Amino acid sequence: MRRRKAPVREIMADPIYNSKVITKFVNAIMLDGKKSVAEKILYGAIANLDARGEEKGFDLFERAIENVKPLLEVRSRRVGGATYQVPVEVRAVRRQTLALRWLIDASRKRNERTMVERLANELFEAANERGASFKKKEDVHRMAEANKAFAHYRW
């Protein structure tokens, strides 16, 4: 374990939407340091959402992330030779990180042609409380609910 906590690095808000969440999302999508490709994918997906007309793309994006953020998760805890799945609350930073990760993973597993389409459709579905990423959150919550009996092992 490290001696002291690593300082949290300040990240710059993105130039178009002036949002730190967008910057984090771009960094999470990025593969092999290709940031411009990652930006093209995300901005393309938001433009795709804009084109659907009902609501602004950025608002759908924010709602999708909010809908996928988990409140509880289970962590393994060994007590006297048995391993228990103990439900714990998720801290705000991890909540956001998990939501971004789940959205990206679900998008990559979809079978539309381009990543822009996949991400746009996954964001749209998550904003409307459907889709694989939202299901992942529901599954995590269900696991926490099922293991509520072990909540007293929290640390």
Curated annotation (Swiss-Prot):
UniProt entry tagged with the keyword Transmembrane: no
Signal peptide range in chain numbering: none
Pfam family membership, one: Ribosomal_S7
Keywords per UniProt: Ribonucleoprotein, Ribosomal protein, RNA-binding, rRNA-binding, tRNA-binding
PROSITE patterns xref list: RIBOSOMAL_S7
InterPro entries (UniProt xref): Ribosomal_uS7 (IPR000235), Ribosomal_uS7_bac/org-type (IPR005717), Ribosomal_uS7_CS (IPR020606), Ribosomal_uS7_dom (IPR023798), Ribosomal_uS7_dom_sf (IPR036823)
Entry keyword annotation includes tRNA-binding: yes
Gene Ontology, cellular component aspect: small ribosomal subunit
Record CDD domains: uS7_Bacteria
Single GO MF annotation: structural constituent of ribosome
GO biological process, alphabetically ordered: translation
Annotated PANTHER family: RIBOSOMAL PROTEIN S7
Function of the molecule: One of the primary rRNA binding proteins, it binds directly to 16S rRNA where it nucleates assembly of the head domain of the 30S subunit. Is located at the subunit interface close to the decoding center, probably blocks exit of the E-site tRNA.
The family this protein is said to belong to: Belongs to the universal ribosomal protein uS7 family.
Subunit organization: Part of the 30S ribosomal subunit. Contacts proteins S9 and S11.
Name of this protein: Small ribosomal subunit protein uS7
Native source organism of the sequence: Aliarcobacter butzleri (strain RM4018) (Arcobacter butzleri)
Lineage of the species this protein comes from: Bacteria, Pseudomonadati, Campylobacterota, Epsilonproteobacteria, Campylobacterales
